């Protein structure tokens, strides 16, 4: 912000910590000389909340901060508002607990990665340094920078790093991960 590279921040966090970002982390860690407007997204919008949300689009020198629950990005209303915010600002978009975007098939993951491409800068945060699977890293890295891991798709990434086996479940054939390779 001080260097003029951003004028907006979109923080996406799990339900359990989203309010803490708004009430605790931002007031505690944002330096005093930065004038800012912070708004916490809520799914049911009152007139006051709508006024607060609209204030994020007023011109001025303030840093505009939108804090959203990750679940909001599973809804059209939430995605549309985040997209409007991103298109109106030079934004840093941060995902807290980035393992919430590990499933490449999930609608929410697809929405968040698409929104991330509209942000000037992206960051991921997690308190879980070890994932359940190396495959969990693909979409998190894709959010940061498409192609970062050198693969055009999740499936080419999976082919390189996962040992797959075909299994039958109720007459349906599916690929399951049975191990990993090329991890060094």
Q: Language-model segments: what does each one mean?
A:
Residues 100-103, 124:
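Residues immediately C-terminal
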């Amino acid at each position: 912000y001080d260097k003029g590279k951003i004028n907006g921040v979109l923080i996406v966090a799990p339900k359990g910590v989203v309010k803490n970002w708004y009430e605790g982390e931002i007031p505690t860690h944002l330096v005093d000389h930065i004038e800012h407007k912070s708004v916490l997204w809520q799914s049911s919008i009152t007139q006051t909340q709508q006024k607060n949300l609209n204030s994020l689009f007023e011109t001025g020198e303030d840093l505009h901060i939108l804090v959203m629950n990750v679940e909001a990005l599973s809804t059209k209303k939430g995605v549309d508002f985040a997209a409007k915010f991103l298109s109106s600002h030079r934004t840093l978009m941060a995902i807290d607990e980035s393992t919430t975007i590990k499933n490449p098939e999930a609608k929410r993951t697809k929405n968040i990665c698409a929104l991330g491409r509209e942000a000037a800068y992206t960051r991921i945060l997690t308190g879980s340094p070890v994932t359940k699977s190396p495959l969990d890293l693909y979409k998190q890295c894709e959010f940061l920078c498409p192609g970062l891991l050198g693969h055009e798709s999740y499936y080419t990434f999976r082919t390189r790093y996962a040992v797959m086996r075909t299994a039958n479940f109720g007459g349906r054939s599916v690929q399951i991960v049975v191990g990993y390779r090329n991890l060094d």
